[in-house]
Amino acid sequence: MAVHQGNAGLPAQAQTIPLRAWSVLAASTLAFMVCFVVWMMFGVLGVQLRADLGLNSTEFGLLTSTSVLTGALMRLPLGTWTDRFGGRIVMTVLLVVCAVPVYVVSYATQLWQFLVIGLFLGCVGASFAVGTPYVARFFPPQRRGLAMGVFGAGTSGAAVNLFVTPLLLNAYGWRVVPRIYAIALLVTAVIFWLASAPDPGAGKRGGSLLDSFKVLRDPRVWRLCQYYSIAFGGFTALSLWIPQYLKNEYGMSLVMASAFAAGFSLPGSVLRALGGALSDRFGAHAVTWWGLWVAWISLFLLSYPATDFVIHTIDGTAALKLSMPVAGFVALTFVLGAVFAFGMASTFKYVADDFPDNMGVVTGIVGLAGGLGGFLLPILFGMLLDFARVRTTCFMLLYGIVWVSLILIYLTEVRRTPVTG
């Protein structure tokens, strides 16, 4: 069933969207949110495991990001399979299969075991590459930005993780948490299957997985990969990193640090729908361009480490201390989370507009780039911290990546004509 049936003579914006489309959107968003809770759980569990296993910052980064790697690598094949078999089937199978490694986490005792299991568990992170093309096919082009923004709000699972996981950990111990989440995946699979509908685009696009790489010849794909590596990669990495940052930098408890960290994750999730609506209204380029500038300013302020100045005056010496208060940190990360949300939504508005016939494949490739960013960044955060011994180096790194994005978008989209004198 296509959304245009019965409305062929109407303008796209005036066409009635079937109730089934909204049901698919709601079911897909729920499934994605639950998957994201599971995908991000090591951001909280890892703090406890770091103490139990005696991990350094680099090992902690590796622990939290291993599952992100698999989620990134699986986005391309799952995006291709979604085009071939349909999002309903692929999402349901993914939820059921991933419940097994999630449950097995509760039996791990050594770092290498967590890493190996995390590789299998991480497949839940590829659910985004399934849901995005699946949902988009039920909506007309003029409403896809909003629809994909609502679906993308499933990343609120990062905030749900920050609220729920610490409470479960304190109440029952960390080994019970993955068992509860495994059951949640199975229950979600049943709900999703009952509330969703057959994919209208299933089976319409053939070709092998190798054929999917042909779209890499288009330079627009590479540009979108770079945008998404900072928007989604930065969001994912900081969602994993900020709880322990707050705990160590400001001496908070894990529950308190996780609650404050939600000030970043929550807007980075729920405002994604607004980012999609703004992309529909003003275009993906405008939202991406101005969002990057806001991120650049926020990261510049967050990058500055606590510093003591000694000033020599005619009356002696005067001390000046500069540091980021908790309120300032929460406010800036709130803004950063919001612009990352806008950036994630605008990137896939680009995808829907520029690649309507290869949406599943391009979604998988761009999602792969974002997931790789989410995998590499926590490890780099840990390496920089172990080397420089300055916690704000994580924001310094992101600041540099945003600079690259701004230069790239200026050269390829803003400066459309040569400068003449």
Where are these regions (language model features)?
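Conserved MFS/SLC helix-loop-helix module at the cytosolic interface between two early adjacent transmembrane helices
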Residues: 73-111
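Glycine-rich segments within core transmembrane alpha-helices of 12-TM secondary carriers
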Residues: 144-163, 367-377
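Helix-loop-helix hairpin linking two adjacent transmembrane segments in secondary transporters
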Residues: 150-196
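C-terminal membrane-cytosol helix-exit motif in multi-pass small-molecule transporters
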Residues: 182-203, 405-413
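Extracytoplasmic gate region of multi-pass secondary transporters
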Residues: 42-43, 219-269
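Cytoplasmic helix-loop-helix junction between adjacent transmembrane helices
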Residues: 117-154
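C-terminal transmembrane helical hairpin of 12-TM major facilitator-type secondary transporters
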Residues: 285-347
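Extracytoplasmic
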Residues: 23-57, 238-243, 377
